[in-house]
């Protein structure tokens, strides 16, 4: 098999002419493989057995973690832009990246909150892909549900189930990203945690355990439609890419360049569409309790202004109204540049590695 091709458990829908009829499984000669053959052709798996669910779980966890790691610094820039829209030095994506790098460094600046992100990255991605694949197979094979509805529903359900794992890490990550380095002399975020452990202890002690799920509804309002759209787009783009490759005389599996392109387009498009809810989610999860609004958080520079917007609430509708009243329509697209880059590149990395790991596991643990 050409090293530029990948096997996949993600379906590519073939036309009836993609696979020539065989003498096995005809109406006159039924056999036990007929049902499986029909399902494989509907799903477009190139007549290869579908990967076991545990392959999808492991592959998804690896792809998600590496993708998140690679793009964390850009996610930090997006968080600063959304959490501090009034700070001029963070308004431009490139200059914001450079400013954070020069002022705060890589580890505590651009990669602030990295350990918090990794706390939920692998398990949540593993749960998502396992749920997504199981739901998709059940809906298509057992219930004969329309493909587009299936992909939207599977992405929606996968993200909902994994949210119980990633939301607490998202709260901690976002606050640490907004804070930057400890005793930050360059930006007063409203938080000053010395490390991840201190952040967990402080949040639970001062705000209660439930605060780790603060903004849960806002997070779901962003992530459920994002995942549903991302994978519906991804499945459709892969089908189109496969048809194009078929016209060029290639059949069976999608080439790596097209795997990268389809993943990037799916993630980037879904990212742009869901940016308004990403803004609300960031504001909700990083707002300060009223009792701490006048508290100085920078020991070395206690009078540095934070440029933070007014506190919102846990209400999505009120948060949307507050953003609109204070910043207008453009406020809903604060950080859209880095979010587009992040979601497109992260999606391409994650989904490419997902496919590659699936192939490796299939070779190491064949199902035949």
Swiss-Prot record:
Keywords: Membrane, Mitochondrion, Mitochondrion inner membrane, Repeat, Transmembrane, Transmembrane helix, Transport
Main location: mitochondrion
Spans annotated as Disordered: 1-48
Topology relative to the membrane: Multi-pass membrane protein
Inactivation phenotype: Significantly increases steady-state mitochondrial magnesium concentration. Rescues the group II RNA splicing defect in the MRS2 and LPE10 deletion mutants.
Top-level division of the source organism's lineage: Eukaryota
Compartments reported by the entry: Mitochondrion inner membrane
Swiss-Prot/TrEMBL GO biological process terms: magnesium ion export from mitochondrion; magnesium ion transport
GO molecular function per UniProt: magnesium ion transmembrane transporter activity
Function noted in UniProt: Transporter of the mitochondrial inner membrane that exports magnesium and thus, plays a key role in mitochondrial Mg(2+) homeostasis.
Protein family membership: Belongs to the mitochondrial carrier (TC 2.A.29) family.
Note: Present with 2060 molecules/cell in log phase SD medium.
Protein name: Mitochondrial magnesium exporter 1
């Amino acid at each position: 098999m050409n090293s530029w091709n990948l096997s996949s458990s993600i379906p590519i829908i073939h036309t009836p002419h993609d696979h020539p009829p065989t003498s096995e499984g005809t109406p006159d000669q039924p056999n036990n493989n007929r049902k499986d053959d029909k399902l494989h052709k509907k799903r477009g798996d190139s007549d290869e057995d579908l990967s076991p669910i545990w392959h999808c779980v492991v592959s998804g966890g690896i792809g998600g973690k590496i993708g998140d790691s690679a793009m964390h610094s850009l996610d930090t820039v997006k968080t600063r832009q959304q959490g501090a829209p009034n700070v001029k030095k963070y308004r431009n994506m490139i200059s914001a990246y450079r400013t954070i790098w020069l002022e705060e460094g890589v580890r505590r600046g651009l990669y602030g909150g990295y350990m918090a992100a990794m706390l939920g990255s692998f398990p949540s991605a593993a749960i998502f892909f396992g749920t997504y694949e199981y739901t998709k197979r059940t809906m298509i094979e057992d219930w004969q549900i329309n493909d587009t509805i299936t992909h939207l529903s599977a992405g929606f359900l996968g993200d909902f189930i994994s949210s119980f794992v990633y939301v607490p890490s998202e709260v901690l990550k976002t606050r640490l990203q907004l804070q930057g380095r400890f005793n930050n002399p360059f930006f007063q975020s409203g938080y000053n945690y010395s490390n991840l452990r201190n952040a967990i202890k402080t949040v639970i002690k001062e705000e209660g355990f439930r605060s780790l799920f603060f903004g849960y509804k806002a997070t779901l309002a962003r992530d459920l439609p994002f995942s549903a759209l991302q994978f519906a787009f991804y499945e459709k783009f892969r089908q189109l890419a496969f048809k194009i490759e078929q016209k060029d005389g290639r059949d069976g599996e999608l080439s790596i360049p097209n795997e990268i392109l389809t993943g990037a387009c799916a993630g980037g498009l879904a990212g742009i569409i869901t940016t308004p809810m990403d803004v609300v989610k960031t504001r909700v999860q990083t707002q300060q309790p009223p009792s701490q609004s006048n508290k100085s958080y920078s020991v070395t520079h206690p009078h540095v202004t934070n440029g933070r917007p007014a506190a919102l609430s846990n209400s999505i509708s009120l948060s949307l109204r507050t953003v609109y009243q204070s910043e207008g329509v453009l406020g809903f697209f604060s950080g859209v540049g880095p979010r587009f880059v992040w979601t497109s590149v992260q999606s391409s990395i994650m989904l490419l590695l997902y496919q590659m790991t699936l192939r490796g596991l299939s070779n190491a643990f064949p199902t035949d």
